From Swiss-Prot:
Glutamine amidotransferase type-1 domain boundaries: 178-366
GO biological process: 'de novo' pyrimidine nucleobase biosynthetic process; 'de novo' UMP biosynthetic process; glutamine metabolic process; L-arginine biosynthetic process
NCBIfam families reported for this sequence: CPSaseIIsmall (TIGR01368), PRK12838.1 (NF009475)
Protein name in UniProt: Carbamoyl phosphate synthase small chain
Length: 366
């Protein structure tokens, strides 16, 4: 593989030089790091990474290639992938192509050969930053100015970029429940888990109205993960608030961005984390069962603990930084978690939440 020099310039002027793989050219976005050892395919195709360049802390990436069934959506959403070493050799009984070839076909840049430990420390200490990767320009001052001109994630509604254009249904022949899932950037494995729990899932556009949803006669509402600032997605917040007000026996379950939107709908506030939670090894305490769960996480915003209104009960707490990881309404059948119980990649400690959702639908259906 021919080595093409590439440069990464952060908005603060820090420079990292390496080589490009995948697509050569230019990429922009917010730089975040992910601590997962595996799962790069799922990470790249997770719509929640829209507008972000992902640094993998594990030093060797690409060694098991790309498999046909592990995408979390139909395309790569991350702006770029940054690694210490990109493996030219891949081996896995299901893999059909290399990471390099996949990125190249998708027009997505990869950057290898940089000191990722140094970059991660800088992000950890100074916060997630906007940046530019380029094989076309070596002018640091110009690239720094370009990075500084990238829109900040705060105030950015990216949901409209990733949501489905058309409603679609993923059926289960033995389905007992009909779930309407708002697509704010939904992952494939979430739909798969809902199917496994006996749900027919109708996936709808993020701007679908409460009237349209209720006309589908759902047994439950699911609020998906997604990218950007939850506070900017005002249409979703208003719809969730209306759904909860109009039907007090309709279960609502939110994950990640969906958790933040549900919290905002009931009057809580959100804020941007310094560098976010991105990885598959975050310990969370379940305050209801007094147990610890190892969780998969991917979010740059969080719900403000002090802003939780009286009707919302804190159910889960992050043991790294004590941030809100789960809430439930004290009277309405509404609950949510900040992390990803469906994992992909990650542990399966929290799969029980899908069962709790179906049990809630069963109880209120009868």
């Amino acid at each position: 593989m021919q080595e093409i020099p590439a440069i990464l310039v952060l908005e603060n002027g820090s420079v990292y030089r390496g080589t490009a793989f995948g697509h050569a050219g230019e990429a922009t976005g917010e730089v975040v790091f992910n601590t997962s050892l595996t799962g790069y395919q799922e990470i790249l195709t997770d719509p929640s990474y829209t507008g972000q360049m992902v640094v993998m802390t594990y030093p060797l990436i690409g060694n098991y290639g790309i498999t046909p069934n592990d995408n979390e959506s139909k395309k790569i959403w991350a702006s770029a992938l940054i690694v210490r070493e990109a493996s030219n050799v891949y081996s896995n009984y299901e893999s059909t192509r290399s990471l390099d070839a996949t990125l190249k076909e998708a027009g997505v840049m990869g950057l290898a050969g940089i000191d990722t430990r140094k970059l991660v420390r800088e992000i950890r200490q100074k916060g997630a930053m906007r940046a530019v990767i380029s094989t076309l320009c070596d002018d640091v001052a110009a690239l720094k100015a370009q990075a500084a001109a990238i829109p900040e994630m705060t105030g950015l509604d990216l949901v409209q970029r990733v949501t489905t254009g058309e409603r679609y249904t993923v059926d289960n022949p033995d389905a007992k429940y009909h779930v309407v899932a708002f697509d704010y950037g939904i992952k494939t494995n979430i739909i798969r888990q809902l199917n496994a729990e006996g749900c027919k899932v109708t996936v709808v556009n993020a701007k679908t109205t409460a009237d349209e949803v209720l006309a589908m006669n759902p047994d439950g509402i699911f609020l998906s993960n997604g990218p950007g600032d939850p506070f900017a997605v005002t249409y979703a917040i208003d719809t969730i608030r209306e759904l909860a007000a109009r039907n007090s026996t309709l279960p609502i379950f939110g994950i990640c961005l969906g958790h933040q939107l549900l919290s905002l709908a009931f009057g809580a506030k959100t804020y941007k984390l310094k560098f976010g939670h991105h990885g598959a090894n975050h310990p969370v305490k379940n305050l209801l069962s007094n147990t610890i769960e190892i969780t998969s996480q991917n979010h740059g915003f969080a719900v403000e603990m002090e802003s939780l209104p009286g009707e919302l009960e804190l159910t889960h707490k992050n043991l790294y930084d004590m941030t809100v990881e789960g809430i439930r309404h004290r009277e309405l059948p509404c609950f949510s978690v900040q992390y990803h119980p469906e994992a992909a990649p990650g542990p399966h400690d929290s799969h029980y939440l899908f069962k709790e959702f179906t049990e809630l639908m069963e109880r209120l259906k009868n």
